[in-house]
């Protein structure tokens, strides 16, 4: 089973927990976040992103101990999970993100950033 399969399976579970699909905010954490709306799950994404940064910094300063490595993996898992909730809310799938990563594969990050800058400037000029 691939990592993509695991993400897709988790996305299906999240989709099933949407209040519109019968998810109960009283018994499901995902349903509760979705019921509360974007501010709730976006706040969690911000918190998890910060905790990911802190765990990485701890790993930088504490050395690659198994505990610190596990902490970073756990925080990234939390970040991905809450990001999957956001994707579901906005009608997107993990496959959309994977397709974007594949599209970028082989493209220099510097080139990609420069291209986005030109595209943003062109869009602003058209507005």
UniProtKB/Swiss-Prot annotation:
A cellular component term, taken from the record's GO annotations: cytoplasm
Alphabetical UniProt keywords: Amino-acid biosynthesis, ATP-binding, Cytoplasm, Histidine biosynthesis, Hydrolase, Nucleotide-binding
UniProt-listed Enzyme Commission number(s): 3.6.1.31
Gene Ontology MF terms: ATP binding; phosphoribosyl-ATP diphosphatase activity
Localization of this protein: Cytoplasm
Residues of the signal peptide: none
Main location class: cytoplasm
Gene3D superfamilies: MazG-like
Top EC class, one word: hydrolase
Stored InterPro entries: HisE (IPR008179), PRib-ATP_PPHydrolase-like (IPR021130)
NCBIfam families the UniProt entry points to: histidine_hisI, PRK00400.1-3
Family (UniProt): Belongs to the PRA-PH family.
Entry protein name: Phosphoribosyl-ATP pyrophosphatase
Organism, as annotated: Polaromonas sp. (strain JS666 / ATCC BAA-500)
Gene giving rise to this polypeptide: hisE
């Amino acid at each position: 089973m691939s990592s993509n399969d695991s993400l897709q399976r988790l996305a299906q579970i999240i989709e099933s927990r949407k209040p519109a699909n019968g998810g109960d905010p009283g018994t499901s954490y995902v349903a509760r976040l979705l019921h509360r709306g974007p501010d709730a799950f976006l706040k969690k994404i911000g918190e998890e992103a910060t905790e990911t940064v802190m765990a990485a910094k701890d790993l930088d300063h504490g050395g690659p101990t198994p505990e610190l490595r596990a902490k970073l993996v756990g925080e990234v898992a939390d970040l991905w999970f809450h990001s999957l909730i956001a994707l579901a809310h906005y009608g997107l799938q993990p496959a959309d993100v994977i397709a974007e990563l594949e599209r970028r594969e082989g493209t220099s990050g510097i080139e990609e950033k420069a291209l986005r800058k030109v595209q943003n400037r062109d869009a602003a000029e058209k507005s």
